[in-house]
From Swiss-Prot:
Listed GO MF terms: ATP binding; catalytic activity, acting on a protein; serine-tRNA ligase activity; transferase activity
Gene Ontology CC terms, in alphabetical order: cytoplasm
Gene behind this protein: serS2
Domain of life: Bacteria
Gene3D superfamilies, per database record: Bira Bifunctional Protein, Domain 2, Serine-tRNA synthetase, tRNA binding domain
Name of protein: Serine--tRNA ligase 2
Subunit (UniProt): Homodimer. The tRNA molecule binds across the dimer.
PANTHER family attached to this UniProt entry: SERINE--TRNA LIGASE (PTHR43697:SF1), SERYL-TRNA SYNTHETASE (PTHR43697)
Length: 425
C-alpha cells in the first residue's frame, strides 16, 4: 500500500507515476477528497473533545461549590453525542480511504519502461543459443504423452481442464527439478520453509492479492480461507505484524508449494500442456531487506533464478517489464523467459520483483533503524523456478529424434543415475 501522506504531499507526481500504470487521475482525486474529509472530521472531533473536557472541569468546580451544574451537564451530554456521531462518520470515511488506497498499485521505479503494452518490455540480456534440430521438434505435451509420463486426459477426467497426472519418470523428473532448485537456494543462503497452503483474507491482503484480485482466487468458503496462488503469500506474511531485528536483515526464505490459479481471462490461451494450469508446483524465493539494500538484492535474486537455467543448460533471456505489465505490488520486475523450440519463442518461467515497502506497509512488517525509529522493510519475491514450466522446457530442449529425452547433467544424481527418459511400459 502507498503512504497516504506521501500521496497528499505529492499529488501531481503520484498521478503521473500511477498514470503510467493505467490508474486514472480521478482515482487519486477521490482518495484525496476522502482523506481531506477524514482529517476535517478528526479536527472537529478533537475540538469537541477539548470542549467536553473544559465543560467537565466546570461541572466539577460547580459541584465542589455546591452550585447548579445542570446546564453544563446538558451541554456535555450534547457534546458527547456529537463526538460519537463524528467518530462514527470518521470511521466510515477512514474505511473508504483505506479501501481506495488498497486498490492503488505500487509506484514504478524510474528505470521501468513506461508503457501499458507488454511487448514494450526491454531485453537486458540473452543467455545461451537455441539448439538447432535436425528434425522437427515436438511440443512438450506430445513428448510427455508419447513417453507415457504426462497424462492430461485422465487429469481432465478427474479434475477438469488444466489438470494432469505426472506418471513414472514424469513424476520423478518433477521431483528432481524442485529438489535441485531447493538445494541450490539453500547453498545461496536461503532458509527452506514448508508453509501452509491455505491462508486467511488478512494474509492475502498483506501481499496485495486482496481486495483487488479476490475474484481470481480459489476460495474455501466453508472456512473463509484461500488456496495460495504462490508461496509468496505465506512467506511474506510469516513476519506480518512483527518487528524484525535489524541484525537479522536481510532474511532469505525459499519454499516449494503448489500454486492454485483461477486463470480467469485465459480462456483459449495455452489450453494444452504445462504452461497454464489451475494447480502447479513452484519454488519461491522471498527476501526481507533494509530499504537501502533492496535494489542490490533484486539483482542477486534475479541472478539466483538465472543460475538455475544456466546449470540446466536452457537458453533464456531477461527482460524488464513495462509499467503496465508489472504485478500490482511491484516497483520493478525482471522476467526470465526460457526458450521453447516447438513454439519458437521465449516463455516466462520466473518473475523477480522488488515490492519496496508496498507489502510491508499492508502487512505491518517493520524493523528499527540505527536511530531506533521503526521503518518498513522492503520485500522481494521471485520464482525459483516454476517447476512444471521447467519440466516442459527440458522436454522440448532435450528431446531426441527417437522420442526419448536426455536428462540434464545436473539432474542425473536426482534421477538416481538415469540419463535418459524412454517410453514407459
Amino acid at each position: 500500500m502507498l503512504d497516504v501522506k506521501m500521496i497528499r504531499q505529492n499529488p501531481d507526481f503520484v498521478k503521473e507515476q500511477l498514470g503510467h500504470r493505467g490508474v486514472a487521475a480521478s482515482d487519486i482525486d477521490d482518495l484525496l477528497a476522502a482523506d481531506e474529509k477524514r482529517r476535517e472530521l478528526i479536527a472537529k472531533s478533537e475540538q469537541l473533545k477539548s470542549t467536553r473536557n473544559q465543560v467537565s472541569g466546570e461541572i466539577s468546580q460547580k459541584k465542589r461549590n455546591k452550585e447548579d451544574a445542570s446546564a453544563e451537564i446538558a451541554e456535555m451530554q450534547k457534546v458527547s453525542a456529537d463526538v460519537k456521531t463524528l467518530d462514527e462518520e470518521r470511521r466510515t470515511v477512514d474505511a473508504q480511504v483505506q479501501d481506495m488506497a488498497a486498490h492503488l498499485p505500487n509506484m514504478p521505479h524510474p528505470d521501468v519502461p513506461v508503457s501499458l503494452k507488454e511487448e514494450d518490455a526491454v531485453e537486458l540480456r540473452r543467455i545461451g543459443t537455441p539448439r538447432h534440430f535436425d528434425f522437427t521438434p515436438k511440443a512438450h505435451w506430445d513428448i510427455g504423452e508419447d513417453l507415457g509420463i504426462l497424462d492430461f486426459e485422465r487429469g481432465a477426467k478427474v479434475s477438469g481442464s488444466r489438470f494432469l497426472y505426472y506418471v513414472g519418470d514424469g513424476a520423478k523428473l518433477e521431483r528432481a527439478v524442485y529438489n535441485f532448485f531447493l538445494d541450490q537456494h539453500e547453498a545461496e543462503g536461503y532458509t527452506e520453509v514448508l508453509p501452509p497452503y491455505m491462508v486467511t483474507d488478512e494474509s492475502m491482503y498483506g501481499t496485495g492479492q486482496f481486495p483487488k484480485f479476490k475474484e481470481d482466487a480459489f476460495r474455501i468458503t466453508t472456512q473463509d480461507l484461500t488456496l495460495i496462488p504462490t508461496a509468496e503469500v505465506p512467506l511474506v506474511n510469516y513476519y506480518r505484524d512483527e518487528v524484525i531485528p535489524a541484525e537479522k536483515l536481510p532474511v532469505y526464505f525459499t519454499a516449494l508449494s503448489p500454486a492454485f490459479r483461477e486463470e480467469a481471462g485465459s480462456a483459449g490461451r495455452d489450453t494444452k500442456g504445462l504452461i497454464r494450469l489451475h494447480q502447479f508446483n513452484k519454488v519461491e524465493m522471498v527476501k526481507f531487506t533494509k530499504p537501502e539494500d533492496s535494489w542490490d538484492e533484486l539483482e542477486k535474486l534475479t541472478n539466483n533464478a538465472e543460475s538455475l537455467l544456466k546449470k540446466l543448460g536452457l537458453p533464456y533471456h531477461v527482460i524488464t517489464l513495462t509499467t503496465g505489465d508489472m504485478s500490482f505490488t511491484a516497483a520493478m520486475t525482471h522476467d526470465l523467459e526460457v526458450w521453447f523450440p516447438e513454439q519458437d519463442k521465449y516463455r516466462e518461467i520466473s518473475s523477480c520483483s522488488n515490492c519496496t515497502d508496498f507489502q510491508a506497509r499492508r502487512a505491518h512488517i517493520q524493523y528499527r533503524d540505527d536511530d531506533g525509529k521503526l521503518q518498513f522493510v522492503h520485500t522481494l519475491n521471485g520464482s525459483g523456478l516454476a517447476v512444471g514450466r521447467t519440466v516442459a522446457a527440458i522436454l522440448e530442449n532435450y528431446q531426441n529424434e527417437d522420442g526419448t529425452v536426455t536428462i540434464p547433467d545436473v539432474l542425473v544424481p536426482y534421477m538416481h543415475g538415469k540419463t535418459k527418459i524412454e517410453k514407459q511400459g
